Every structure is written in C-alpha cells, then in structure tokens.
C-alpha cells in the first residue's frame, strides 16, 4: 500500500482520534517537501552546478531549479544573480513517493544511523533534515558522482504545533531518535 493510501485509510483516522480533533480537515497532513542544496563552489565551478542539478533531479524525479544570490557578498566572492545552488519543491504523488523512499530506503542506508533528531521541528510543525551525502539514495551510484555533497530536506505540514507534526511523521514511519 502506498504512503498516500495508508495516510488516508489508517493514519488520518488514528490521528483524528489520538489528537482529539472533531473534523477530518483538522488532522495534519504533509503539504510539500522542499529539497535544497547550496553550492558554494558553483560561483567558480559551473560543472559542479550541472552535476548537482542532475543529481537532485534524479533523486526527486522532478527538474531542479537553480537558486541565485539575492545580493552580492564580497567575503564569499559572489555577485547578485550568480547561481549558488538548486532546489526542488515536491507536491502530490511525487511528494508521497519521495517521502516513502526517504523513510524506507535512504535513511536506513546512513552510516551509524540511530534515528533522526526529534528536535528538528521549527515550532510550527515543519520538519527539516540535513543529509550529509547523496549516496544514501539508491538512484545515485558511487561511480557517477564527482564529489560528495549534502542537501537539506524540509517536510512542510499543515500541523499547528510540533507535537502534531511529530505525531504525523511518526505514524508515517519516520524513525525518530529516542533521547
């Protein structure tokens, strides 16, 4: 059963009861997933940006967008409008497919993985996770990469509090570390 169907048939009714909501629309859901990769070397090395764009596109199944510098920072040797990274916003079916792959395939492949930090919520029910290397995703092979790069994955939920967001992700199978 796909994660979307499991959410509709089992997770949503369980959260409705557990969180004490009266209406099905009050139950938190995943709204979107942002995958972001900042590349400091992209300003000098355009090949790094191209490789990064193709990797993020392969991992997410959606074309990555080039992010550009909003203003010039001399200390980082960047000018306004220079490419400094890439980002993808996933919604709908691709979002659920990516979340399922992240939870079931990618996270267990992290070395010495003991669970994700339950403190990585932003106060409004959204969860952000930093990944140190792209090799945890099965779509990326070691032979095809030029450098090991990480990325930030933000799971945006409709939850109003961190507790609601944590309950939603825990039911979806997110392996939280017990402190």
Swiss-Prot record:
Q: Does the keyword ATP-binding apply?
A: no
GO biological process: any one? translation
Q: Name one Pfam family in it.
A: Ribosomal_L5
Keyword list (alphabetical) reads:
Ribonucleoprotein, Ribosomal protein, RNA-binding, rRNA-binding, tRNA-binding
Q: Which domain of life is it from?
A: Bacteria
MF GO annotations: rRNA binding; structural constituent of ribosome; tRNA binding
What PROSITE patterns does this protein map onto?
Answer: RIBOSOMAL_L5
Gene3D superfamilies per record: 3.30.1440.10
Gene Ontology cellular component list:
ribonucleoprotein complex; ribosome
Question: Among its keywords, does the record have Ribonucleoprotein?
Answer: yes
The record's section on InterPro entries has: Ribosomal_uL5, Ribosomal_uL5_bac-type, Ribosomal_uL5_C, Ribosomal_uL5_CS, Ribosomal_uL5_dom_sf, Ribosomal_uL5_N
Q: What does this protein do?
A: This is one of the proteins that bind and probably mediate the attachment of the 5S RNA into the large ribosomal subunit, where it forms part of the central protuberance. In the 70S ribosome it contacts protein S13 of the 30S subunit (bridge B1b), connecting the 2 subunits; this bridge is implicated in subunit movement. Contacts the P site tRNA; the 5S rRNA and some of its associated proteins might help stabilize positioning of ribosome-bound tRNAs.
Q: Which PANTHER family match?
A: 60S RIBOSOMAL PROTEIN L11-RELATED (PTHR11994)
What assembly does the database describe for this protein?
Part of the 50S ribosomal subunit; part of the 5S rRNA/L5/L18/L25 subcomplex. Contacts the 5S rRNA and the P site tRNA. Forms a bridge to the 30S subunit in the 70S ribosome.
The record's comment on protein family reads: Belongs to the universal ribosomal protein uL5 family.
State the protein's name: Large ribosomal subunit protein uL5
């Amino acid at each position: 059963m796909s994660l979307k169907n499991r959410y509709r048939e089992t997770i949503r009714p369980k959260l409705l009861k557990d969180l004490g909501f009266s209406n099905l629309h009050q139950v938190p859901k995943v709204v979107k997933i942002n995958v972001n990769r900042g590349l400091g070397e992209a300003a000098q090395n355009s090949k790094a940006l191209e490789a990064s764009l193709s990797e993020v596109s392969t991992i997410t199944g959606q074309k990555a967008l080039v992010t550009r510098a909003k203003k010039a920072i001399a200390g980082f040797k960047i000018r306004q409008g220079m490419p400094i990274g890439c980002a993808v916003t996933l919604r709908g079916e691709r979002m659920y497919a990516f979340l399922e792959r992240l939870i079931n395939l990618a996270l267990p492949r992290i070395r010495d993985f003991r669970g994700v930090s339950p403190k990585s919520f932003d106060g409004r029910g959204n969860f952000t996770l930093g990944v140190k290397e792209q090799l945890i995703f099965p779509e990326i092979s070691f032979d095809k990469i030029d450098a090991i790069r990480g990325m930030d994955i933000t799971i945006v939920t409709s939850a109003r509090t961190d507790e609601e967001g944590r309950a939603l992700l825990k039911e979806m199978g997110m392996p939280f570390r017990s402190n």
